Amino acid sequence: MVPVENTEGPSLLNQKGTAVETEGSGSRHPPWARGCGMFTFLSSVTAAVSGLLVGYELGIISGALLQIKTLLALSCHEQEMVVSSLVIGALLASLTGGVLIDRYGRRTAIILSSCLLGLGSLVLILSLSYTVLIVGRIAIGVSISLSSIATCVYIAEIAPQHRRGLLVSLNELMIVIGILSAYISNYAFANVFHGWKYMFGLVIPLGVLQAIAMYFLPPSPRFLVMKGQEGAASKVLGRLRALSDTTEELTVIKSSLKDEYQYSFWDLFRSKDNMRTRIMIGLTLVFFVQITGQPNILFYASTVLKSVGFQSNEAASLASTGVGVVKVISTIPATLLVDHVGSKTFLCIGSSVMAASLVTMGIVNLNIHMNFTHICRSHNSINQSLDESVIYGPGNLSTNNNTLRDHFKGISSHSRSSLMPLRNDVDKRGETTSASLLNAGLSHTEYQIVTDPGDVPAFLKWLSLASLLVYVAAFSIGLGPMPWLVLSEIFPGGIRGRAMALTSSMNWGINLLISLTFLTVTDLIGLPWVCFIYTIMSLASLLFVVMFIPETKGCSLEQISMELAKVNYVKNNICFMSHHQEELVPKQPQKRKPQEQLLECNKLCGRGQSRQLSPET
């Protein structure tokens, strides 16, 4: 038997609930479900600030890395570790975050995560070394992962039933606003001395303010009931719903908590209610979220844009700001229209457009003849000084550059003479050419050469940027928000939290693998072929969505769960790929003629197996 879906359980994005009518009232929702006053809204917005902090931390490394890699002379692998260390922390937190949230509370977890984010950011700006950078980023990763889980659960549990989807979706909207804010910060401090410190430090005041504000907000009433504090839970519900009698909602919460004990974690891997199929669908879906390349665009946006012709840090950061703007603009209509268009439709459209834009970007990049083939920096100090001359201008090669002069003092006359062609190969604009560095004895893998902007035709550069923006927009309406909505719908309430924790761990794990190898893979095969690989993955995700993801538009959670609980669900979905929403809705039995009813009765009794129904005239 399929358990009744728990509408009080935590959900993500626009979770659908079953409409409830009270006797004789004609109202679609009971009184306690209609109470969504200003206090509930402000509490949700305050908690959703965590989403802004998460988005900011995800996007800020894109611009900060341009300065840090030069300052610390980071190698390709070291850059990947700086980026991926945040994901390492997030993965660790996703494995244990659910236990912490259930033991200490959702509100407390948000407060702790805000404080940890501020502490990690403070570590980054006070002391700069490679090791400290890794430690600080891991701390921030733990913070954003913990806050992501706690925020969605907290908002879902304080929101009334009919406003839960809207209020929980605030978190997703705040994430993309945070990413946009990070890209704006990258541009604002691109040419500022030690601008990376300002980039990392801007979130500290906001994190502290959120922690203080959350202290004065009430705990989740559901958490209080879990801890046996029903009196306190009743008072909190009274404030949130502006009602004096909260008995009915308390009864619903207690009933839903009983449902959760019907399942264990291991039921996710058993055939009970087709759970094994459901978890495989969920894990595969989050796999495609990461393997289609979006995390790398997020983390390495400025680096990618520099490789296609946006030469200066400022130009690359400004272009990446467009990525943030597109994400915000695309996410808003997707959030508002998902109940009308359907999550499966958005997933199909998003994957299709992603594939088209990626193949366009790959073809364009094949026709951009750059002066370099590698985007990794050397960790050699002499190469660092030479690279700084390109990034910060030819003035760094003058006799006023004490760092470079000290290097010359420590090398032999023969080695020094090998660098002399550099002087003669600097053209009128003071730019170092590829040939000059090669004549100096430096291999392609030991430096990053920034090309003359004139070497890249303007229309190719802007076409590449346009393809990137279309790719980002397609992801933002499809594989960005929709998988989390699907995940919140395909699992019963009694096991949804544990299923979400498992898929979240899978999400961060694949993210770690992708971000940890992006520069290395790009260095080996080139950016165009990376785009082509992501194209194949996008097409594979489209095929998977068409074959396995149900269209849940207009269906209640109970109807969705009943359909997915069928043993032959996957077989039916593959054979009949034209599933529509109405097929998930149980149909009312049609009235049949007496002859048909008799035939059906005989079949059930085993006496009419060979009989055929005569055609009606």
From Swiss-Prot:
Predominantly expressed in skeletal muscle, heart and prostate, with lower levels in brain, placenta and kidney. Residues 1-44, 102-115, 159-172, 219-278, 339-345, 488-498, 550-617 are cytoplasmic. One of its GO terms (cellular component) is perinuclear region of cytoplasm. The chain crosses the membrane at residues 45-65, 81-101, 116-136, 138-158, 173-193, 198-218, 279-299, 318-338, 346-366, 467-487, 499-519, 529-549. Coiled coil: none annotated. InterPro entries: MFS_dom, MFS_sugar_transport-like, MFS_Sugar_Transporter, MFS_trans_sf, Sugar/inositol_transpt, Sugar_transporter_CS. The keyword Cell membrane applies. GO terms for biological process: circulatory system development; D-glucose transmembrane transport; hexose transmembrane transport. Residues 8-17 have a biased composition (Polar residues). It catalyses: D-glucose(out) = D-glucose(in). CDD domains: MFS_GLUT12_Class3. It is a multi-pass membrane protein. Keywords: Cell membrane, Cytoplasm, Glycoprotein, Membrane, Sugar transport, Transmembrane, Transmembrane helix, Transport. Belongs to the major facilitator superfamily. Sugar transporter (TC 2.A.1.1) family. Glucose transporter subfamily. This is Solute carrier family 2, facilitated glucose transporter member 12. It comes from Homo sapiens (Human). The lineage of its organism: Eukaryota, Metazoa, Chordata, Craniata, Vertebrata.
